[in-house]
């Protein structure tokens, strides 16, 4: 599996709205914790260490 960095989410604006809404009403600490949990859930779903390493490099 390779890292996909081209747009790949159907209705990206809808997803972004869902993501923002998930943070509604949270404190900064709660929002940071939500982001951390989401990252770990998605990393577990991907499961491929090489893809995760490539994603970390791309994000940095």
What are these model-derived regions, one by one?
Residues 13-16, 39:
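Short amphipathic alpha-helical surface patches that serve as generic macromolecular interface elements
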